[in-house]
Amino acid sequence: MKTIDYRGDTRTSKNQSDADGYSSCSTLKGDVEISGTYSGDLQLNGVKQISGGLSCDGASNMTGLSASSLNSIGDTFKLTGLTTLTTLSFAALTKVGSIEFTALPQLQSLDFTKGVTEAGSVVITNTGLSSLNGISLETVGGFDITENTNLKTVNVNNLKNATALINFAGNMDGLEIEFPNLGTGQNMTFRNVSSVSVPSLEKLKGQLGFWGNKFQSFSAPNLTETSDLIFNDNSKLSNISMPVLKTVNGGFQIARSDKLNVIDFPKLETVTGAIDFSGEFNEAHLDSLKLVRGDFNMQSTGNISCTTFDNMAKNREVIKGTETCKTTSNPETRDGKSGSTTSTGKASATSTGAASALDVSSMPAMGLAAVFGALVQYAL
């Protein structure tokens, strides 16, 4: 087997004969592009390595793509707009520079027999996939999975570290996500999922956010530190368990999660931004809290006790910003939006604790900061 060097050039396959021209080559140095006019199935036989990327854009009549011997793609594996593709078979593939699969509505499964264990990033959007079996990453940069409305389960069992955003949004409402061995990461955001399992997660450098999900319970038994922490509009959420969470390096918001009756973070000591809890809960326990650099807003329809938090605000000993704590029929978030699904969010007279507002400036959080920009505040 030989090596063909196409560095600085892109080889375009317009038909199977073009692809067969590579069959005597174990290594292709350069990029391989499949023509957007290709129709039917395409096989890349014999090739074991592509140093550049492998791509196909707009081949709406391509039905299958396979490469039984290919074990690595040095750059991006990019497939876009292959609207009739039903087969993607790469039995030996274990390493890619990155994966970008977009608009593959007929593709229901990945035939990656050995499993892709190395990828700089993964973006999968608007496909027919029901699972991500075949993606067996141990580490990854970004992991962005969106608009896959047939996606039922994601279990990346071997993943231990992520260095960029992990994002799930717009997939099947019943999507169940498992990262059983993920220990550290950057940012993680989840929308419209039915369960998230992160039993080994210990530390996030960025945010952890949940919006509009359907799960009843969330547990992070080993998480000690994260940046912004957000639970917003999770209508069925009745339990949050983070028994060893100690530090939130940013803002902490719980809002519009009306089934949540008790808020309890027994080991939480430090929040460097604002605390913003609103809803219909009856109890709130932050027994270890020593420092809140920003404002403190707690509003609920439930009969909450504010004595402890009022005392924390005295002389700015714990709460450095403005403290608002009250029972009200219209709980609001810190920025005046409705804090429960039954509240109006209209402005109303409030009583505040002893701490007056500091001259604070907003510091944008990492990742999707615009979603909750005003939440994160730091004392000057």
Roles of regions detected by a PLM:
Residues 1-7, 375-380:
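N-terminal signal peptide
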Residues 5-21, 28-43, 50-85, 89-107, ...:
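Concave beta-strand-loop units of leucine-rich repeat
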Residues 311-314, 357-359:
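Short, intrinsically disordered, charge-biased short linear motifs at domain edges
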Residues 320-341, 370-373:
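Acidic, glycine- and Ser/Thr-rich low-complexity intrinsically disordered tracts
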Residues 330, 336-358:
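Low-complexity, Pro/Ser/Thr-rich intrinsically disordered segments
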Residues 351-380:
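Cleavable C-terminal sorting propeptides in eukaryotic secreted/cell-surface proteins
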